[in-house]
Amino acid sequence: MSNNANVAAAIKEVAHKVFGGYAELLRMPHTARFSIGSVIACMPFPMVGMTITISVQHYYGNYSLAGVLTAIQAIALAVSSPLLGKLVDKFGQRQVSIPTILVWIVAAIALTTSITNRAPVWVLYCLTPFLAAIPPWGAMSRARWTTMLKGDRERTDRALSLSGVFDECMWIIGNPLASTLAVISGLLAFSFTGVCVVIGALMFLTELTTEPKSQTQLAREAGLTREEYRKREAAKADRKSTRLNS
């Protein structure tokens, strides 16, 4: 009996060492809301490609078409993600995310309707790239952690690690979930993904206290144009780098 108690105590101690730091971060005010919200809103990343593949094969009986559409969405995502990230830095998280989400929702509804009604293939080609209109939730979440924990290197590293854990969980859950729902109904899979986007976005974007300021806001507060502000910050970074290297 004592051996079992010792094993249980050891497991508890290891779990505390591994997850205790994460729990501490999530107990901080406002952090659980935006962290969990970002994961929920990220569900299109693992789910859309699988949903397109299974739905197109079901309605069109063509794996080649499904593969091409999935590739188009992936390429569009690779192009749009850094561009959206840059816009977020310039104009702010809410200012960029809200119109981006609206584009995604309209595109998802249009593509789902087109697939279920067996629309001409060219319609699918035109609509699919717009499903890459996904805000960079992971990057925005990490930006919030970095801003909140500025100066605390240890907890910042732990927070970024936690963000990585959440990302992995999203992919582990999202792919099989998308497969299951899409086999039942492509409409169900897209609808579920859309609900995740709306719920996650509301959780994340309505948490205003942790949102970092955009370059536009910082420049306005400094009485500078955005270009002047960027040049000033670049000069500061150069001076800091010179001091560190000297």
Residue locations for each model-derived region?
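Cytoplasmic membrane-interface "Motif A"-like loop-to-helix N-cap segments
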Residues: 90-102
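Cytoplasmic helix-loop-helix junction between adjacent transmembrane helices
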Residues: 129-169
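Helix-loop boundary and gating motifs at the non-cytosolic
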Residues: 12-78, 239-246
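Symmetry-related core transmembrane helices of the 12-TM Major Facilitator Superfamily/SLC fold
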Residues: 189-206
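Helix-to-loop junctions at the C-terminal end of transmembrane segments
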Residues: 80-93, 182
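Hydrophobic core of transmembrane alpha-helices in multi-pass small-molecule transporters
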Residues: 39, 120-137
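C-terminal ends and interior cores of transmembrane alpha-helices
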Residues: 102-118
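Transmembrane alpha-helix termini and helix-breaking/packing motifs in multi-pass membrane transporters
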Residues: 173-193
